[in-house]
C-alpha cells in the first residue's frame, strides 16, 4: 500500500511540473472560470454548452460536456497574440478572453486557442510560440470556417490586445459583442465603422481567413449583462486589479 501511495505522489508531482514555471499561468478558481466562460454565451445556450477549463500542465480540458454544439472557455493567451510584428517576449498573466464558438468555429478558430495553450503548457517559450503559430497561420494549417457562423463574446469583461496588428498594448474592456465569421473580408468591403469600443455599427477585425465582423451590444443590453454578473465582476476584481472594470468608461488599465 505504501508503495502505491508513493508512486501516486510521484506521478502527481510530475503532472504538476509538466508546465514550465516561466510559462505557467495561475489558473482561475474552477467555478469562477466556468462561470466566466459561460458568460460569453447568450442565456438560452448556456445550459447545454460544452465548457472547458485550462489545465496549466496540459492545456484545455472538458469541464462539462454539452449537447448543443457550442463550446465556451476562457483563453489566457489569445489568437490576437500572434498578430503583428511585435515580439511576444513573455506570457502575460492578465489576459482574460472569454469566448464561445459554434461547431464551425470549433473546427477552425478554436483550434488556434487550444493548440497554443497546449504548446504553452509543454514549455514552449513565448517568442517561439508566436513564431510557430504565425507559420501555421501563414501556411493555412488552420482552415477558415466551412460555413457562416458565430462566436459569442458577451461576457462583461475582456482583457486583451487593443490593436494587435500594430502593437502589444493591452486594455481591460466592458464590451459584450457578437462576432460573425468574415474570412478574407476587409472593413472597407462592408463599409465598416471605425473599430473602437462602443461603436454602434459593425466592423472587421483580424482580417484574413480567421477574420470577424464585430457587433457590440447596445448600452441598455450591456448594462443588463453587467447587472447579471455583478458578483462575478467583483470577484474577478478581487483576484487581479487589472480585471477591475472602470466606473465611467468602457475601458481601463491600458498598458
Language-model features, listed with the residues they occupy:
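Positively charged n-region of N-terminal signal peptides that target proteins for export
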Residues: 1-6
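Bacterial N-terminal signal peptides
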Residues: 7-16
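Primary mode marks residue(s) on the alpha4-beta5-alpha5 output face of response regulator receiver
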Residues: 22-255
Amino acid at each position: 500500500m505504501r508503495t502505491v501511495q508513493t508512486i501516486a505522489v510521484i506521478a502527481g508531482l510530475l503532472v504538476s511540473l509538466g508546465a514550465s514555471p516561466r510559462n505557467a499561468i495561475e489558473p482561475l478558481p474552477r467555478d469562477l472560470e466556468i462561470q466566466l466562460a459561460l458568460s460569453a454565451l447568450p442565456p438560452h445556450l448556456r445550459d447545454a454548452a460544452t465548457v472547458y477549463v485550462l489545465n496549466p500542465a496540459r492545456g484545455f480540458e472538458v469541464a462539462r460536456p454539452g449537447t448543443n454544439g457550442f463550446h465556451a472557455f476562457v483563453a489566457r493567451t489569445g489568437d490576437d497574440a500572434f498578430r503583428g510584428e511585435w515580439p511576444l517576449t513573455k506570457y502575460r498573466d492578465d489576459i482574460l478572453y472569454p469566448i464561445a464558438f459554434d461547431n464551425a468555429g470549433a473546427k477552425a478558430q478554436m483550434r488556434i486557442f487550444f493548440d497554443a495553450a497546449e504548446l504553452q503548457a509543454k514549455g514552449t517559450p513565448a517568442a517561439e510560440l508566436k513564431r510557430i503559430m504565425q507559420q501555421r497561420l501563414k501556411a493555412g494549417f488552420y482552415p477558415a470556417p466551412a460555413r457562416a457562423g458565430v462566436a459569442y463574446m458577451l461576457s462583461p469583461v475582456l482583457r486583451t490586445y487593443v490593436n494587435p496588428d500594430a502593437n502589444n498594448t493591452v486594455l481591460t474592456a466592458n464590451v459584450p459583442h457578437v462576432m460573425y465569421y468574415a474570412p478574407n473580408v476587409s472593413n472597407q468591403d462592408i463599409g465598416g465603422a471605425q473599430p473602437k469600443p462602443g461603436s454602434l455599427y459593425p466592423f472587421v477585425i483580424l482580417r484574413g481567413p480567421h477574420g470577424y465582423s464585430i457587433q457590440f451590444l447596445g448600452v441598455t443590453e450591456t448594462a443588463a449583462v453587467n447587472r447579471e454578473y455583478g458578483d462575478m465582476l467583483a470577484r474577478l476584481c478581487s483576484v487581479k486589479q487589472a480585471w477591475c472594470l472602470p466606473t465611467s468608461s468602457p475601458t481601463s488599465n491600458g498598458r
